[in-house]
Curated annotation (Swiss-Prot):
GO molecular function, one term: guanosine tetraphosphate binding
Lineage: Bacteria, Pseudomonadati, Pseudomonadota, Alphaproteobacteria, Hyphomicrobiales
EC number: 3.6.5.n1
Assigned keywords, A-Z: Cell inner membrane, Cell membrane, GTP-binding, Hydrolase, Membrane, Nucleotide-binding, Protein biosynthesis
NCBIfam families in the cross-refs: lepA, small_GTP
Protein name in UniProt: Elongation factor 4
Gene this chain is encoded by: lepA
Compartments reported by the entry: Cell inner membrane
GO CC terms of this entry: plasma membrane
Amino acid sequence: MARMSTNSTTPLSHIRNFSIVAHIDHGKSTLADRLIQTTGGLAEREMSEQVLDNMDIERERGITIKAQTVRLHYQANNGEKYILNLIDTPGHVDFAYEVSRSLSACEGSLLVVDASQGVEAQTLANVYQAIDNNHELVTVLNKIDLPAAEPDRIKEQIEEVIGIDASEAVLISAKTGLGIPDVLEAIVRKLPAPKSPGGEKAPLKALLVDSWYDTYLGVMVLVRIIDGVLTKGQTIRMMGTDAKYQVERVGVLTPKMVNVDSLGPGEIGFITASIKEVADTRVGDTITEDKRPTAQALPGFKPAQPVVFCGLFPVDAADFEDLRAAMGKLRLNDASFSFEMESSAALGFGFRCGFLGLLHLEIIQERLEREFDLDLIATAPSVVYKMYMTDGTERELHNPADMPDVVKISEIHEPWIRATILTPDDYLGGILKLCQDRRGIQIELTYVGTRAMLTYDLPLNEVVFDFYDRLKSISKGYASFDYTLTDHREGNLVKMSILVNGEPVDALSMMVHRTAAEKRGRDMCEKLKELIPKHMFKIPIQAAIGGNVIARETISALRKDVTAKCYGGDATRKRKLLDKQKAGKKRMRQFGKVEIPQEAFIAALKMGDE
C-alpha cells in the first residue's frame, strides 16, 4: 500500500464529486478507465480493461454490480489542481439501490448516452434518481466513432425524453480516447463543488456510502465527509447502530489504496476500524466522533428490501455446511442478500434466500457455484405475498409451501410494479400482447421518434418468472425494461400443488393466478411426464388446487413378460400369471416410492424459460 503525505484537506472549491449514469453497455466503465488513464491514476502497465469491475462476473457479463470509487488528480486548463472523486455505479435495475447510495455521495453526474442507440429505460430511471438528488448533469455522447452514431438526433431525443438541455453535450469515444480532456474540463467547469455547512472546525459528520470485506484488512468502509475532519486513531460512532470503533487506517482509492493522514469536508475515502462484519455497517448511516458528536444525523437511505425469494439447495447434501459458509461470505459484501435455513422433503436441507431481483439471484447463484465450487438447485422464484387472515391478523408469505389453509385467509395481496419499456415500434404489437398476457394494465403509451415508450402496471409474480427473457426475444434484444415497486393489490391467487403418485412435492408448489393455473398445471405435468423415468407401476402426476385436480398425466408402467415361459399350453395358466402380476403391481402402487431425479427438478423449475 503506497503512502501519500497530503496536506490534511483540500479546499472545497477544488473538489468535484461525480458519478456516471448510463444504461448497460453504453460505455460507462470504459469511460471511467479513460479518465483514470488520462489523469495518471494508474501506470500504463497496471491498466486493464474495466479497471473498476473487479469481479470476474462483472467483466464477463460486461455489467457493473458493486459501485466502485476512484480519486483522480487533475490539472485544469486554468492551471489549478483539482481532486475529482468518481463513483462508478451499476446500470441494471436490480442494483438501483447501489446507484441511489452512490448518487447521494456526489453533487453531479455525467449522463452517458450511446450516440448510436440513444436513451434507454435504465438511463431514464437513473437520471431521474440523479435529478431527485439535485445533481447537476453533464451530458456525454459516447461511441461517436461508430458509423451508426447520430449525435444530433440523440441530442434532440435527450431533450425530448429527459427534458434537459443537451446542446452543449460533450462528444467522445471512450474506446479511442477521443474527447476525454473535454469531459474533464466540463466536470471542473459545470459541476458544483461540494458544500460543507459546518466546515472543518465542526464536529465530524460523514455518510457511510458503502462497505466491503477485504481478506487482509477486514471490513473497509467508504465514507463521504460532510463536516469536520476524519483522522487516524479517532474514535468514531455509527449513529444508526450506536457502535463505536477506533479508526486504524484512513485512505483514498486511486484505484489503488493509498493511505492518507486525514480526510476533510467534501472528500471521499475509506477507513478501516477492525469492524467484524459488513452487516455491522449500515449503508446510509452517519459516522460521527464519539467525544464530539454532531447534533443531527444525515437522512439515511431506506434499506434494500428483498423482492424475490427462492430456495437454494446443494445437489450433494454433504455440501450444506460449505454452502452456509459461502453465503455468509457473500453476505459480507452484499447486505441486500438475505438467507435463512429451510428443509424440503424432496431436496433436503438448504436455504431460503431473498434477492433484489432476478439478475441479483442469477449473479449470487453464479458466484456461489464459481467462487466456492458448489453445485446448486434453485427452486422456482417467488415474491412476497401479504395475507390478511380471517382472525384479523396479517402475515407475509415467502414460500408457497408454507401457505396456511385457504379457509383461514380472507385476502391475498401481491406486489405490483410500474414498468417502463422502451422499444422500436416494429415490436410494439408483440410487447403489448406479452404485457396483456401477464395481466398488465396499460398506463400510457408515448412515442419518442421511432421508439415507443410504454408504462405498464404489472404483478411482480408474472415478471419474476421469465418476463425479461421473453421481452428480449420478442424485440430481438432491442427493448429495454426498468421497474419500480409500487404497492400490494388484492389478487385472485391460488396455491398449485404438484402430486406425484398422490404425494405432494413441496419444491414444485407455486402461487399462480386462478386464470393461469390450468395452463401452468398442464405444462408442468407434461414436463414431469417426460422427465420422470418409468417404474414397475403406473404413476399419476397431478396438478391440484386444494382438493381439485386441474391437470393430470400418467406415466405407464414397465412390465415384465411373465407369460414368456409358457410354450403353447393352457390359456388359464397365462391368465393366472397375468392376474398374479396385476396383484403385485397393485401392491407396488400402494407402497412403491417414486424416485424423482434431480434433473427432473431442475428442468421443471426452468419450465418458464421456453
